[in-house]
Amino acid sequence: MRRKLIHLALVMLALFQMSTIAATPVQIEHQGLLLNANWQESAEPGRGPLFLIVHGTWAHGGMEIIAGLQDSLAVNGYESLAINLSLGISDRQGFMSCDKVIKANHADAAAEINRWVEFAKTLSDHIVLVGHSRGGNQVMLYQQQFQASEVERLVLIAPMTWNPAESAADYEAQVGRPLAEVMAQAHGDPNAIITAGVVYCPAAEVLASSFISYYDTEPNRNTPELLATVARPVLVFEGTEDPLASGFKSQVALFEKNQQVTVQWIDGADHFFRDLYTDELVDGILEWLQR
């Protein structure tokens, strides 16, 4: 009984510390766009590396999994910066909408991540770059194009996988139009605005070059392929209850010989690692950092 009371007291203390450390909005400029992020201090500033966190598809830095990661890292004494990719919109907040012309480009994330890395370098010489879902793939695209020595490690949480045949079949099933037909239209004039289903939007006005970035073979959106040649330490998390994880599991052979890559499965977790699974993520990350 006494042990349980002590444990409860420690948990309550941690929650109190967490509640007194509010995330601070940060804004910088990049190529004429205002970029937003949430800066989370910790109870013990300077304890370890700074975590720079990238959200998933058309999401934002305040979504549940990202905010949970920041809170858990803060309780453990680590500072973090959760960014909002602009998706082509200056001062973007919240989830992406289908109501306006979509100019988001999958590949543009790499340069925006680099802009935030440059900012983060003014705060810390040791950076861990974290990406969830599509953000995990975009973190890998970043590391292919930019080589900041301060970015020492990468963490990918349920990173995106991609198969061209499956993508085409899924697109036609969801939208009712062959993907090849829309791609031909988009390639005909990449600067045109076309009407098409794209990502989560069943029908939207979208810049043709943006559409291409989400459905063409380049940039490479199949993260297991990118892991084959990564030259810095990478930790990949997958949840056993994530229906999307099968695409990753089936391609482990592509990178299993690369000793830089560590894969950790979390039993019971789905794609978003909610509640206590978020703490398991952070525990796994911190244990990995000590190796």
Stretches found by the model and what they are:
Residues 230, 236-238:
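Short beta-strand/loop motif that positions the catalytic acidic residue
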Residues 243-249, 274:
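Conserved alpha/beta-hydrolase "acid-adjacent" motif
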Residues 86-104:
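Cap/lid segment of the alpha/beta-hydrolase catalytic domain
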Residues 100-122:
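Alpha/beta-hydrolase active-site loop
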Residues 44-76, 80-85:
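Short, surface-exposed "cap/lid" segments of acyl-processing enzymes
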Residues 119, 124-175:
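Primarily recognizes the serine-hydrolase "nucleophile elbow" in alpha/beta-hydrolase
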